[in-house]
């Protein structure tokens, strides 16, 4: 829910009152003399001359009464050829870990906006499944999927990776492969999951290196179309893997790591034993222990 506050003259407030008279509501606020509710947006006019608009999209109504949204500033590099990389599945008990790196140029922006490309966290799975194939066909990218079986072979105590270093390895490899395919970016951005210092610490252990500098930026999938594209393709790859695993075991495997995952994991243990979790889940998650506790 958003809130917009406008300082208005008495004349402007009078116009607002007339326009919204049919939407007027009662108010018990001693400092307010008018209130209304229009299509989910609440409006309150105060004796101080301030008027608040509050709702899911308050800017729509507020714009009728003088509100002008500040133009969004394009992040540095948005108008450059950009490689963006993102991962999906690291927070889900079931399913693999998908990492995708994509190259987006300014010439791609109109196409991407026509599809409604945005941070995949704001898109439902149905929409992601719909537009991901179009992105895969149009946008140069490299996609990697670490299956649960392989994940459990390399991640854990005494193994080659921990839960963070394995993501560094996958991001590095996806970007490396994209560069090797001929991609020529002006900038490379990864949706930040680690500090740059620690990223470089793990990066030094990688076999495949490249000289191009990397920028780690928080919430990059909402700022850069290249990262948004990678996020969407990675989410689709993760979902397809989850579907495949679900078919193999005969249970619908949920995304996430909540109580539902504990319940399904316990059913898998009862039906198939420990090996079922080794091949469908990230075994080191706390869900494994919780699933065993459910069987006691």
From Swiss-Prot:
Cofactor notes? Manganese or magnesium. Binds 1 divalent metal ion per monomer in the absence of substrate. May bind a second metal ion after substrate binding.
Q: What is its EC number?
A: 3.1.26.4
The answer to whether UniProt assigns keyword Metal-binding to this entry is: yes
Q: Which InterPro entries match?
A: RNase_HII/HIII (IPR001352), RNase_HII/HIII_dom (IPR024567), RNase_HIII (IPR004641), RNase_HIII_N (IPR024568), RNaseH-like_sf (IPR012337), RNaseH_sf (IPR036397), TBP_dom_sf (IPR012295)
Chemical reaction(s) catalysed? Endonucleolytic cleavage to 5'-phosphomonoester
Compartments (UniProt record): Cytoplasm
Q: Where would you say this protein principally sits, based on its record?
A: cytoplasm
Q: Which UniProt keywords apply?
A: Cytoplasm, Endonuclease, Hydrolase, Magnesium, Metal-binding, Nuclease
**Domain of life of the native organism:** Bacteria
Record keyword RNA-binding present: no
What HAMAP family does the record point to?
Answer: RNase_HIII
Alphabetical list of NCBIfam families matching this protein: rnhC
Q: What is this protein called?
A: Ribonuclease HIII
Instruction: Please name the source species.
Output: Streptococcus thermophilus (strain ATCC BAA-250 / LMG 18311)
